[in-house]
Amino acid sequence: MSGLPSDMDLYKLQLNNFTEVTMFILISFTEEFDVQVFLFLLFLAIYLFTLIGNLGLVVPIIGDFWLHSPMYYFLGVLSFLDVCYSTVVTPKMLVNFLAKNKSISFLGCATQMFLACTFGTTECFLLAAMAYDRYVAIYNPLLYSVSMSPRVYVPLITASYVASILHATIHTVATFSLSFCGSNEIRHVFCNMPPLLAISCSDTHVIQLLFFYFVGSIEIVTILIVLISYGFILLAILKMQSAEGRRKVFSTCGAHLTGVTIYHGTILFMYVRPSSSYTSDNDMIVSIFYTIVIPMLNPIIYSLRNKDVKEAIKRLLVRNWFINKL
């Protein structure tokens, strides 16, 4: 019986009779079962923490009146975005750790790449919008309610999603218009553009340039918005006479600046580096960091030193405790 080909072997043999790949196989770090079980448990714990942490921020932001301000609305959208971003990648990855059949359909791969690109790009724009929000709140606090009214922050959030969907659509259509007539094995835990281009049998030079310029433009624009916003914030801090006022500003901006540095630092390391330093394993590790690990870290970063969020969570817990006692 051991000499009979497995289902996966039969599928690979059938590929020779077709001109186009209709399914992909996701190849992760290792084929050793014990290691895969460990990775399954590790990333399951990370995913559960991501869900609990981010939804634990969304609920008080929605339910607590004291958090009904643009700054916390942006944070709530970011937390919801992180849940979506992680959910696009993690469940399929967890299944593949334990499953013998690690395949994903052509349409499923395109959908996963489109959603991951959409949520990842939206996070870039949203972090820039949050920097502008903090600039308005600190540099001109008396006009904050006017400068950051629903007529301003709702279009900012909407535009972030619309621009990201457009960006993701262009890259997804361009990538899956290529021919995949050779190997169908993707050395990655999810469908991402670089490993897909690596297995295409078409000329990918134009698409690689398109991808580089699009990602580079988004990074430059969003980072510039962050830098300009924090430049004005720094000027406002230097004008402050109160040490308590400076402490509040650092507390308000420190978490966001940390989140921006980690996220954009990872993206820049991923895409703005010499091609000679590219390896599929490094690509996989960095991709896991910004799609799975960062969404887990964000609730810690944004709530650890935020007294308003911690007080809102306490009020929510006390309120639920009293309701259960009635």
From Swiss-Prot:
Keywords: Cell membrane, G-protein coupled receptor, Glycoprotein, Membrane, Olfaction, Receptor, Sensory transduction, Transducer, Transmembrane, Transmembrane helix. Glycans are attached at N17, N101. SUPFAM superfamilies: Family A G protein-coupled receptor-like. GO terms for biological process: G protein-coupled receptor signaling pathway; sensory perception of smell. GO terms for molecular function: G protein-coupled receptor activity; odorant binding; olfactory receptor activity. It is found in: Cell membrane. The keyword Cell membrane applies. Disulfide bonds: none annotated. The chain crosses the membrane at residues 38-58, 67-87, 112-132, 152-172, 209-229, 250-270, 284-304. It comes from the Eukaryota. Pfam families: 7tm_4. PROSITE patterns: G_PROTEIN_RECEP_F1_1 (PS00237), G_PROTEIN_RECEP_F1_2 (PS50262). It is a multi-pass membrane protein. Residues 1-37, 88-111, 173-208, 271-283 are extracellular. PANTHER family: OLFACTORY RECEPTOR. Odorant receptor. Belongs to the G-protein coupled receptor 1 family. This is Olfactory receptor 5T1. The lineage of its organism: Eukaryota, Metazoa, Chordata, Craniata, Vertebrata.
